[in-house]
């Protein structure tokens, strides 16, 4: 189509006005010219973007420049580059604001800076692979974009060497977006295409025309025709596509044909989000209508839709789209029977999903390690990026925990023979899961700090071969004497215990013979102490030891785990006396609840609230359950299981001391006993997912496998943050190691939650827990009693099944939710629950499958809630593509 002079004039006026506005707002822009000298900056002449040196954001790499002859072909931010000949992983670190959404762009141009233009290396966003960067010649430029919502206040972008080629980078650009745009259920978005559809100029553009500095490329197709207008188009919605893109569009050349957009050359596992921008840019006659449906892989997903006159409407998918059975991704705009005009499309953005599955190391621990690195001047070539992940690139001398769906934490730090000077840094105390600390063979000075004694997880401290002085904290020496910690201090001639330091001070004015003699005696005593400690420790490995806290000489209930070693939390989960329990509960002053086991009291231990469960009678069954729970909780640790703080066993006085769960149990909240506040559907899904994770850990994360046997809403407790944790393990059973798929037991559990197959056969499997959890899920959806003799069907599962058979899901949903939920997630949870309740255990899902289903539902509900909070300055101009989402609770819509 010819480009009219009038339209060209409008286009040039818009373009010139934007470029001449040198003071145009660049707040939220971070533009790094990689490899340029520190403190240098410039304004790029075609975009007027100000770039600064990257030197303040990275400590490694060397600067370089492209060949002089290439500079006229490329923008100035690519004239320099930073290469990384040393190390495997090198990272940029930017301090930003958690929750902000950024467009992140990495630019690569070899430009002949060395004689090896053929390269391949990897680009990482934090601990997750972003993309593989490949160059084959000097003038091949590559750009990688990611739209990412920050989950921490530190962003790291890393280049990783994967072969012999040297990684490099030319420019790094971050553009802050509005937090209401480009929302996903999970993961981040990598740019697949950003197209100015129907563009009449074959040239891309970015900032100065696009307020967010998105890079747009022209896109036309042989069977499409371009249309344009010289009128202005309102672009003021959240996405703000550039007006230059919106004053042009494409329509099918054949007015009866559909507009098909096919994504080719894509692996069928890739998921996409699609954003389409529409505006009617033709003056329609009174009898003209432009109306069309949006199809995906021959399925109707939105419409009929009519673009607004000279006003931008943005249509997007709130959930990812996937390939069909043939691996195809085909979007189609098809005119309706009421339409006199063909469909049109002005602009389009398509992004692939990068799930970024690897969680970053705990934020506080990363800060601690960065501070330790800086303060000690640690110069280890691999101390770049995240200390723990990915595992292949973790820091030397650092070991971490790696548990699915949990943030990695540092459990071991070895800085021996690292040339450290100064005092022992208090930053170490921020490593709250640290078990082993080795600072040996350095030049550390000062005293042994008290905070080391207060780190509850520490089991081994090696301070030998330093220049430490003063007294060792008495609490640390006491922990060593009790065997809860191993302390090595050899070679620190100025160190002494508190007692020996006092003696030395008192006799300071004596003759030289006295201190020499005292030193010899001290050496002898220390040596004797070490020998004694080693002997006792050796005996401890071969014989059950006495509990130092009991004072009664009784043997602990659980002194060895099933793997043949003492559980690491024995020292923390200590045995208490009955007198201790009386003090903790202030003579059993406040009752929290009562159950079949006994009474639960409120208590305070070490200034922290606890719950104390007392066994009322020393029955054989009660003692057996008590012993089972202590033994289980001393070896099982998970964030979604209640934590045992201590226990007491003195004759018939038996108690369990737990962390205090401030918000009681799930049943109380569903029943309204906790007040008028209502658990939202998102809150219920979160509780379901967390308790499912705890149960899944018992089934699959414990060796031998553990079956809870009493899953119910009263055994799901909620802490002050409403995090759910499974409780009450008195009926739990461990499976013997081996190939057994079930054990034969006397039936135990709670009526209504009890697996009928287990009740009938006495055969217990993990699928018995799955049945009980299915009942819990139905309670979360319906808020109905498990057994109600007044109902047409007394058991909740039978009643829900009856309602579903009548196509009446509306009547089963808790009316307290007031319709504030995504009906698809209701359906999904009910379907999952009914599968869990299958009479045949072999046809029930595993808890792993249940966790996956619930997380999917939670993500969908979170995305819906984020979407409902979005504002749009053009009212109804921003429309979601509803991918099989229903608007009413109607089973027919599914």
From Swiss-Prot:
Gene disruption phenotype: Reduced infection by filamentous (hemi)biotrophic oomycetes (e.g. H.arabidopsidis and P.parasitica) and fungal (e.g. E.cruciferarum) pathogens, independently of plant defense mechanism. Hypersensitivity to abscisic acid (ABA), displaying enhanced ABA-mediated inhibition of seed germination, root elongation, and stomatal opening. Impaired repression of ABA-sensitive COLD REGULATED and RESISTANCE TO DESICCATION genes upon oomycete infection. No obvious modification of defense-related gene induction during pathogen attack. Hypersusceptibility to the necrotrophic bacteria P.syringae.
Active-site feature positions: 710
Chain ranges on the Extracellular side, renumbered to this chain: 24-515
InterPro entries reported for this sequence: Kinase-like_dom_sf, Leu-rich_rpt, LRR_dom_sf, Malectin-like_Carb-bd_dom, Prot_kinase_dom, Protein_kinase_ATP_BS, Ser/Thr_kinase_AS
EC numbers, comma separated: 2.7.11.-
Primary location class: membrane
Location of Phosphothreonine modifications: 577, 745, 750
Entry-linked SUPFAM superfamilies: L domain-like, Protein kinase-like (PK-like)
GO molecular function, a single term: identical protein binding
Ligand binding (ATP): 592-600, 613
Transmembrane domains' residue ranges: 516-536
EC category name: transferase
One Pfam family linked to the record: Pkinase
Topology within the bilayer: Single-pass membrane protein
Modified residues (Phosphotyrosine): 658, 758
GO cellular component: plasma membrane; pollen tube
Inducing factors: Accumulates during infection by filamentous (hemi)biotrophic oomycetes (e.g. H.arabidopsidis and P.parasitica) and fungal (e.g. E.cruciferarum) pathogens, being locally expressed in cells surrounding the pathogens both at early and late stages of infection. Induced by microbe-associated molecular patterns (MAMPs) flg22 or elf18.
Function of the protein: Negatively regulates the abscisic acid (ABA) signaling pathway. Required for full susceptibility to filamentous (hemi)biotrophic oomycetes (e.g. H.arabidopsidis and P.parasitica) and fungal (e.g. E.cruciferarum) pathogens, probably by triggering the repression of ABA-sensitive COLD REGULATED and RESISTANCE TO DESICCATION genes during infection, but independently of immune responses.
Protein name per UniProt: LRR receptor-like serine/threonine-protein kinase IOS1
Native source species: Arabidopsis thaliana
Gene transcribed to yield this protein: IOS1
């Amino acid at each position: 189509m010819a480009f009219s002079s009038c339209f060209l004039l409008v286009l040039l006026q818009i373009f010139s006005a934007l470029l001449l506005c040198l003071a145009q707002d660049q707040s939220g822009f971070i533009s790094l010219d990689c490899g340029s000298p520190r403190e240098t900056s410039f304004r790029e002449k075609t975009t007027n973007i100000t770039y600064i040196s990257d030197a303040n954001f990275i400590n490694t790499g060397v600067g370089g420049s492209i060949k002089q002859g290439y500079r006229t072909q490329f923008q100035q931010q690519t004239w320099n580059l930073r290469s990384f000949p040393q190390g495997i992983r090198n990272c940029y670190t930017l301090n930003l604001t958690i929750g902000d959404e950024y467009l992140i762009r990495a630019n690569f141009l070899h430009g002949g800076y060395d004689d090896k233009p053929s390269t391949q290396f990897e680009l990482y966003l934090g601990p997750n692979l972003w993309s593989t960067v490949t160059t084959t010649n000097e003038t091949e430029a590559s750009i990688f974009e990611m739209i990412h919502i920050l989950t921490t206040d530190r962003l790291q972008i890393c280049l990783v060497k994967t072969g012999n080629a040297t990684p490099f980078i030319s420019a790094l650009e971050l553009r802050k977006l509005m937090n209401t745009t480009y929302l996903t259920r999970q993961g981040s978005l990598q740019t697949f295409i950003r197209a100015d559809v129907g563009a009449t100029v074959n040239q891309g553009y970015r900032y100065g025309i696009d307020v967010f500095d998105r890079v747009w490329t022209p896109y036309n197709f042989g069977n499409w025709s371009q249309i344009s207008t010289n009128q202005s188009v309102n672009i003021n919605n959240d996405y703000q596509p550039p007006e230059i893109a919106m004053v042009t569009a494409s329509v099918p050349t054949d007015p009866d044909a559909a507009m098909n957009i096919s994504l080719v050359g894509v692996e069928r596992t890739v998921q996409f989000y699609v954003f389409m921008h529409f505006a009617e840019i033709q003056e329609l006659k009174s009898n003209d209508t432009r109306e069309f449906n949006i199809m995906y892989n021959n399925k109707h997903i939105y419409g009929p839709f009519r673009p607004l006159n000279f006003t931008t409407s943005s249509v997007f998918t709130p959930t990812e789209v996937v390939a069909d059975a043939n691996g195809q991704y085909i979007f189609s705009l098809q005119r309706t029977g009421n339409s006199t005009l063909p469909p049109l499309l002005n602009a389009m953005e398509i992004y692939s999903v990068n799930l970024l599955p690897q969680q970053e190391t705990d934020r506080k621990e990363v800060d601690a390690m960065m501070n330790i690195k800086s303060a000690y001047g640690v110069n280890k070539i691999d101390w770049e990026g995240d200390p723990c992940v990915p595992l292949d690139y973790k820091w030397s001398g650092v070991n971490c925990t790696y548990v699915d769906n949990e943030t990695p934490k540092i459990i071991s730090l070895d800085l021996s023979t690292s040339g450290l000077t100064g005092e022992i840094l208090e930053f170490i105390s921020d490593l709250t899961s640290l078990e082993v600390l080795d600072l040996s063979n350095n030049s550390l000075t000062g005293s042994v700090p008290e905070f080391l004694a207060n780190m509850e997880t520490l089991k081994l401290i090696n301070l030998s071969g330093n220049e430490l002085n003063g007294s060792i904290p008495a609490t640390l020496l006491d922990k060593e004497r009790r065997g809860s910690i191993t302390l090595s201090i050899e070679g620190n001639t100025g160190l002494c215990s508190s007692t020996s330091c006092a003696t030395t001070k008192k006799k300071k004015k004596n003759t030289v013979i006295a201190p020499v003699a005292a030193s010899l005696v001290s050496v002898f005593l220390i040596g004797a102490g070490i020998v004694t400690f080693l002997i006792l420790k050796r005996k401890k490995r071969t014989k059950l030891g006495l509990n130092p806290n009991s004072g009664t000489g009784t043997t602990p209930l659980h002194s060895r785990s099933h793997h043949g070693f003492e559980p690491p939390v024995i020292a923390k989960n200590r045995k208490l006396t009955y007198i201790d329990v009386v003090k903790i509960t202030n003579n059993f002053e406040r009752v929290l609840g009562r159950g079949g086991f006994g009474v639960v009291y409120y208590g305070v231990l070490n200034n922290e609230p606890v719950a104390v469960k007392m066994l009322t009678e020393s029955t054989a069954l009660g003692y057996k359950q008590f012993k089972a729970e202590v033994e289980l909780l001393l070896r099982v640790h998970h964030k979604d299981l209640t934590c045992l703080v201590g226990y007491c066993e003195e004759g018939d006085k038996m108690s369990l001391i737990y962390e205090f769960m401030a918000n009681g149990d799930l049943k109380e909240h569903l029943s309204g006993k906790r007040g008028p506040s209502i658990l939202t559907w998102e809150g219920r899904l979160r509780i379901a997912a967390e308790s499912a994770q705890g149960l899944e850990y018992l089934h699959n994360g414990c060796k031998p496998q553990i079956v809870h046997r009493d899953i119910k809403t009263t055994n799901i407790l909620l802490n002050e943050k409403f995090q759910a944790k499974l409780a009450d393990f008195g009926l739990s059973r461990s499976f013997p190691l081996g190939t057994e798929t079930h054990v034969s037991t006397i039936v135990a559990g709670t009526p209504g939650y009890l697996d009928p197959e287990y009740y009938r056969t006495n055969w217990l499997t993990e699928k018995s827990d799955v049945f009980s959890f299915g009942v819990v899920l139905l309670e979360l959806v319906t808020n109905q009693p498990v057994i109600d003799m007044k109902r047409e069907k007394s058991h909740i599962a039978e009643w829900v099944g009856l309602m579903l058979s009548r196509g009446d899901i509306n009547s089963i949903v808790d009316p307290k939710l007031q319709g504030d939920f995504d009906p698809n997630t209701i359906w999904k949870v009910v379907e999952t629950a009914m599968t869990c309740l299958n009479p045949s255990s072999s046809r029930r899902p595993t808890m792993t499958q249940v966790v996956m289903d619930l997380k999917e539902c939670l993500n969908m509900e979170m995305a819906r809630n984020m979407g409902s909070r979005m504002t749009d300055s053009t009212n109804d101009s921003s429309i979601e593509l509803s991918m099989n989402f229903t608007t009413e609770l109607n089973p027919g819509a599914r």
